[in-house]
Amino acid sequence: MALLKKRAHAFDMHVQDMTLRITASPDLYEECRASAMQFWDQLHSFALRNQRFGTSKLPVELADDAPPLMMDIARKTALAGVGPMYAFEGAVTDYVGRFLASQSGEAVISSGGGYFALTRKRTKLTVFHGEEKDDGLAIVVDPKFGQLGVYTTMGRRDLPVESVDGLIVLASSCTLADAVGVYALGLMAKPDPLKKTLAYLQGIEGVLGGIVIRGGDIGVAGAVEIAA
């Protein structure tokens, strides 16, 4: 990850088995960690009380009195066509990112193969989509998009590596980006994968764009600006 901002402060923060690499100013480590752990506890407790929320691979409908944050996860994963369990890490990243943005106005976070970005000016973000260090693309993060969530195949577990060389999804949140990324990977194993995957990305509300890489073919959907 590369953020072109001179006075940003970078630090690692651990939330259960997640490691968040945070670039933000000022240094809000303690407040940030307290906020993240509070949300994680809420998420974990809700999943224990509502088993399908934490185990279903398919969309889950929650009761009307469910906490707003859990309703948001269920709604966004349903848009993608998958269960809430696939977006837990993205939801934590979103929560931390929104907290940091409320304190300092901007933040960049990387976690595994996901990124959260909110900046005041056009920023170049290098996202890695494969297993090698040179499997990276520099994309432009434009402030007009507001909060940006990015899913990539870098560092993901149990990927169908024979089906995709790289996948990048840009969405209005990490929660949505993660959920859409999971569904898109399934499409990559089907006939005519690029066409099906790009059409899917263009049809989901909240998805800003995506890049699909397979063999020598690259497909681009939506408002993705690749930096020179």
List PLM regions with ranges.
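An interfacial alpha-helical scaffold signature
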Residues: 31, 40-41, 45-50, 58-84
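Conserved mixed alpha/beta catalytic, RNA-binding, or beta-rich assembly cores of soluble enzyme
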Residues: 71-82, 86-96, 100, 104-197, ...
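Flexible, glycine/charged-enriched surface loops at secondary-structure junctions
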Residues: 46-61, 106-107, 112, 190-221
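Glycine-rich anion-binding loops and their surrounding alpha/beta cores
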Residues: 6-8, 126, 217-228
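Short, conserved charged micro-motifs
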Residues: 28-33, 176-178
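N-terminal basic/disordered segments at the start of proteins
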Residues: 1-28
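Short beta-strand scaffold segments in enzyme catalytic cores
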Residues: 20-22, 114-118, 210-213
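N-terminal subdomain of lithium-sensitive/metallo-dependent phosphomonoesterases centered on the IMPase/IPPase/PAP
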Residues: 44, 48-54, 92-100
